[in-house]
Regions:
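N-terminal acidic leader/helix
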Residues: 2-28
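Short, charge-rich amphipathic interface segments used for partner binding and complex assembly
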Residues: 29-64
């Protein structure tokens, strides 16, 4: 499968992170930290479309500190 362009990929990642933040606000049992780490390790890192620094910046933009 071909890689999608970087701008689209970043948009998808940002939307996913924002959705995770929304879920954390509505579900007190949801572990945002663990899910963010899992998302990075199992999806972002293997796909190698963005760097760790870019991912961390998107986390900040989504409200994950």
């Amino acid at each position: 499968m071909d890689k999608i362009d970087k701008k689209t990929y970043i948009g998808i990642v940002k939307f996913t992170l924002e959705s995770m933040v929304d879920l954390a606000k509505s579900d007190k049992n949801y572990d945002l930290t663990a899910d963010t780490i899992h998302y990075y390790e199992k999806t972002i890192k293997p796909e190698m479309q963005i760097s760790q620094d870019e991912f961390l910046e998107l986390c900040k933009e989504a409200g994950i500190k």
